[in-house]
């Protein structure tokens, strides 16, 4: 399975609460890497966020880091692509409850074998969800994380992101939904904003950023 298919899915009161819970009030968080803007680069083409190095750290490490048990799943898209994910329903980072989704870098043959051994299949709005065997769940936890999606529980004003991340290299608006993607290729980061929705931050290794951006460019337009 290609990396592209795996990789592919004034401050208001709430924004002030986000800042307060994350950094400014009442003081520094216990861990600086609890913050979504604390991005490290162990190497030029790698990224480390929330204490996890994408492309190296595995799902087991994420469970230890977040002190929560993940929910592993296998998804089949309408065009037949298989994607392995683990989902954290609620993690507490810098005092802010959030959801985290990890896409797992599993070889295509392994994904197909897991699919064939699946216990149950349910139809979702975006394809099919396969319940994995206990053995495959344990195996899934040993493969590297290819992308991390962070979903904070509060709506956040754009000014917060500008202050913490700076100006994006590009802004791309989806034609169909109107959502706007702020792109930071040097950090492998795509921040999705718009329509009054809560933000979504997706991190990938910078070397794979083109694979994330390509579908956006095909289905959207670059804003001036």
Model-identified regions with their sequence ranges:
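Short, Lys/Arg-rich N-terminal segment immediately upstream of the first membrane anchor
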Residues: 1-5
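Hydrophobic membrane-insertion alpha-helices, especially the h-region
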Residues: 6-26
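A cross-family detector of function-defining hotspots
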Residues: 25-34, 59-224
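Acidic/histidine-rich, surface-exposed loop or edge segments in extracytoplasmic proteins
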Residues: 39-50, 136-146
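Short, flexible active-site loop motifs that bind/organize anionic cofactors or intermediates
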Residues: 49-52, 151
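Glycine-centered tight-turn and secondary-structure capping sites
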Residues: 55-56
